[in-house]
Design a protein with these regions (language model features):
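Conserved helix-loop-beta element of the AMP-binding
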Residues: 128, 195-214
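AMP-binding/adenylate-forming
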Residues: 103-117, 128-187
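Conserved S/T- and glycine-rich ATP-binding loop of Class I adenylate-forming
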Residues: 30, 90-93, 129, 178, ...
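AMP-binding/adenylate-forming catalytic core of the ANL superfamily
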Residues: 178, 288-404, 421
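Adenylate-forming
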Residues: 185-203, 220-225
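Nucleotide 5′-phosphate-binding alpha/beta core
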Residues: 1-89, 94-112, 116-120, 216, ...
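Conserved AMP-binding/adenylate-forming
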Residues: 205, 214-309
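Short helix-loop-beta connector
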Residues: 123-127
């Protein structure tokens, strides 16, 4: 199903004309309304009139998370605060949150973007959404809530946590769509197996999972444990929140709402644009946002873009599954390591649960890497030889795929703490 066929299936030349008009208008808008960008333009010797089409986007300055923190809280606002109707914020490593501002029009645009996603998943006004993303400053809960409301569906605003209550309301209210992080969905899948009701009594059919990277193997696990069709929803608070991109029924990539958020793929080291299909850093430019528009915002997400028409009929660009983040990438003894690679290896082996914790340290100037992994209940045993065999099997597979030796420590089922939000998978104790 398609929510907005005129946009989602638009001829790409026509879409490019819309993007060009909007970018020209946005360059004027930020120059006259955001002192931060006016200063950037002046430092570069750039005038708004120099931006004549979407091809000129490469002339615009980059924006990064540090710029948002340096202008905390409202230094990047493009309208008076009297026009701001919603303030979201995400936590940062400095302790100072990244603040995002929305006008009424921005919220309507965001709800439209998420409506496209939910409709692509097959959801309608007849569905009951259980929104188990966190509500509050995090964009996930309220974003999914407003998108579901916009298509006319019923919403259970349960937020994250309180797993027993999640299962009770999911069962009693007949929830058909679950919105949460994939790691929390795995936790709910475990809870469903152990709860008092058989899975056949639940009406769940669709999962909209995002806010953290996940793999195809994890999708299979989620679909099996929850009895659903699992879809990826992509977003980041700085750009809008969930709904920046979404999968269709073909699941051959994530369609990006590029009439609102213009994507580029850059070389993460040089900042130069990369050709279609090349892995690089994803960057977004707001084309319509009023409250706090950003130019060429560097997400640090690593992916590639594809512009050929999808079999679903949509012409919106498709993004590959996020491999990881530039700033999530670990360099251990000279090898680039992404948490998503580790997860993929674990999920291919039937003896292990998809819950792990990587602890990286430096001893005597040498990197060490300990990987704690849960063994499934059916395979966990007191027999030392069997457990050592499992350990060696996983270590060999990790070395084969990633090219690095890990010291694997096997733990009992549920031996790794669960998260109701984004899963913490890495502890890096090195002083780099």
């Amino acid at each position: 199903m398609i929510w907005n066929q005129s946009i989602e299936c638009m001829d790409r030349e026509q879409l490019r004309e819309i993007q060009s008009r909007r970018l020209v208008k946005m360059a004027e808008y930020v120059y006259h309304n955001t002192p931060f960008y006016r200063k950037k333009f002046q430092e570069m010797g750039l005038e708004p009139g120099d931006i004549k089409s979407i091809d000129d986007i490469v002339k615009l300055p980059f924006t990064n998370k540090l710029d948002l923190r340096d202008n905390y809280p409202f230094g990047l606002a493009a309208v008076p605060m009297s026009q701001i109707v919603r303030i979201h914020a995400s936590s940062g490593t400095t302790g100072k949150p990244v603040v995002v501002l929305y006008t009424r029009k921005d919220l309507a645009m965001w709800a439209e973007a998420i409506s496209r996603a939910f409709t692509a998943y097959g959801a309608t006004k007849d569905d009951i959404f259980q929104v188990a993303y966190g509500y509050g400053l995090f964009t996930g809960g309220l974003g999914a809530h407003d998108g579901a409301t916009n298509i006319g569906a019923s919403v259970i605003p349960i937020s994250s946590g309180n797993t027993q209550k999640q299962m009770t309301l999911m069962h009693d209210f007949g929830a058909t769509v679950l919105c949460c992080t994939p790691s929390y969905a795995m936790f709910l899948g475990e809870a469903m197996r152990e709860c008092e009701w058989p899975r056949e009594e639940f009406k769940l059919k669709i999962g909209a999972f995002g806010a953290e990277p996940w793999t195809e193997k994890m999708r299979e696990k989620l679909e099996e444990s929850l009895g659903i069709k699992a879809y990826d929803i992509y977003g980041l608070s700085e750009i809008a929140g969930p709904g920046v991109g979404y999968e269709c029924e073909c699941q051959h990539g994530t369609h990006l709402n590029e009439d609102y958020f213009y994507p580029e793929i850059l070389d993460p080291n040089t900042g130069e644009p990369l050709p279609e299909g090349t892995l690089g850093e994803l960057t977004f430019t707001h084309l319509t946002k009023e409250g706090m528009p950003l130019l060429r915002y560097r997400t640090h997400d690593l992916t590639a873009l594809h512009y050929d028409k999808c079999a679903c009929g949509r012409t919106l660009v498709r993004m590959d599954r996020i491999l990881g983040r530039c700033d999530d990438m670990l360099i251990i003894r000279g090898v680039n390591v992404f948490p998503s690679q580790i997860e993929d290896v674990i999920l291919k082996l039937p003896e292990f649960e998809p819950h792990f914790l990587l602890i990286v340290d430096r001893v005597n100037n040498t990197d060490t890497s300990e990987l704690k992994v849960e063994v499934k209940e059916d395979y966990f045993t007191d027999d030392m030889a069997t457990m050592v065999g499992l350990q060696k099997k996983l270590e060999a597979e990790l070395r084969s795929v990633i090219g690095l030796g890990f010291k694997v420590k096997l733990v009992e089922p549920k031996g790794i703490e669960r998260s109701t939000g984004k899963a913490k998978r890495v502890i890096d104790n090195r002083k780099l």
